[in-house]
Design a protein with these regions (language model features):
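Periplasmic/cell-envelope proteins involved in peptidoglycan metabolism and beta-lactam response
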Residues: 1-179
Length: 179
């Protein structure tokens, strides 16, 4: 009787140990492999916390054109600027409530800072924000402009893709909007 009772305790102990290990593995999976998707989730209010410490990084085309940048006025107010307006509107997207496009997909990267640790510490001491990382896209300005011009006044969409790699070189949609 004592052996079977002891055996039941051992089985229950191992069962709880296995469940505990599975739970720890589940947490590690989400913390290591899924953290970026949780941070990018538009319902995540911690995104606002990141933006308090980091100036959102730039988005650039493959050929070096700045598609989105953050401008800071003398009062410290930040405004997201899109120099090419509706030319890259659908591809780059916009920030704010309901953001989409690269602004949404690369949110984690844009709000991350890889500046030198000493500079980050110095900025923290001075109460200044660290610069966010720059995201370089596969979009090509000249191809984008050509596709935009080819659509003319017609509504529609044009996507130019490099078939061997899957890189999107141009992505235009009309009617466009001014982000």
């Amino acid at each position: 009787m004592a052996k079977s009772k002891n055996h039941e305790y051992v089985v229950v102990t191992y069962l709880f140990l296995a469940l505990f290990i599975a739970l720890i593995g589940y947490f590690i999976y989400f913390m290591v492999f899924q953290s970026e998707s949780f941070i990018n989730n538009p319902y995540n209010s911690l995104q606002n916390l990141f933006s308090e410490y980091v100036v959102r990084g730039d988005i650039e085309s493959a050929d070096g054109y700045t598609l989105a940048t953050t401008k800071t006025d003398s009062d410290g107010n930040e405004t997201r600027s899109y120099p090419y307006k509706d030319l890259f509107a659908h591809a780059v997207g916009y920030t704010g409530h309901g953001k989409f496009g690269l602004e949404n997909q690369a949110n984690f990267l844009l709000l991350r800072s890889h500046s030198m640790y000493a500079n980050q510490l110095l900025n923290d001491i001075k109460g200044e924000k660290n610069p966010g990382d720059t995201v370089v896209t596969t979009l090509n300005y000249k191809l984008q402009q050509t596709a935009y011009d080819a659509l003319g006044s017609h509504d529609g969409a044009v996507i130019v893709m490099e078939p061997s790699t899957g890189k999107i070189l141009a992505m235009v949609s009309k009617p466009a909007f001014d982000p």
